[in-house]
């Protein structure tokens, strides 16, 4: 599997434009100007990732905008943006539903859908080498 993908001026990564597979870009990163400048130098216009499982949008010069504060399609036409799409299976923002986005080239629309986290939690608990907390947190969306 490739570490990243591009389509025109859009970059797709799992984690960060700097380290596409491992680096966390947490909401508080927006208060570290050097870090954010380095990240935004790596993208042309829009980047999508989700390593932290915290859906929302990063801007070059503003604080992180959490998904739950965005109503309807959000325009991504002026400036650069990093969109964290959240998580399809293990959300960490207090909402147990899966999170994904629809991108039409001009706007990002965050969507949520129910999934059977109880079934997933049971499967996790059956794996003896995994801590029970990994399954229990699914019920809290954490």
Residue ranges of each PLM-predicted region?
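Acidic, His/Gly-rich catalytic cores of divalent-metal-dependent hydrolytic chemistry
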Residues: 62-142
């Amino acid at each position: 599997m490739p570490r990243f993908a591009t389509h025109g001026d859009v970059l797709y990564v799992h984690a960060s434009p700097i380290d596409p597979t491992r680096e966390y870009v947490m909401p508080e990163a927006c208060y570290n100007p050097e870090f954010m400048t380095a990240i935004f130098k790596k993208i042309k216009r829009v980047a999508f990732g989700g390593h932290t499982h915290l859906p929302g949008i990063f801007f070059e010069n503003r604080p992180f905008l959490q998904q739950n504060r965005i109503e309807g399609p959000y325009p991504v036409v002026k400036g650069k943006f990093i969109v964290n799409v959240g998580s399809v299976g293990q959300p960490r923002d207090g909402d147990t539903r899966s999170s994904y986005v629809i991108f039409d080239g001009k706007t990002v629309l965050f969507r949520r859908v129910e999934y059977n986290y109880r079934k997933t939690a049971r499967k996790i608990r059956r794996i003896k080498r995994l801590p029970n907390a990994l399954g229990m947190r699914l019920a809290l969306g954490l």
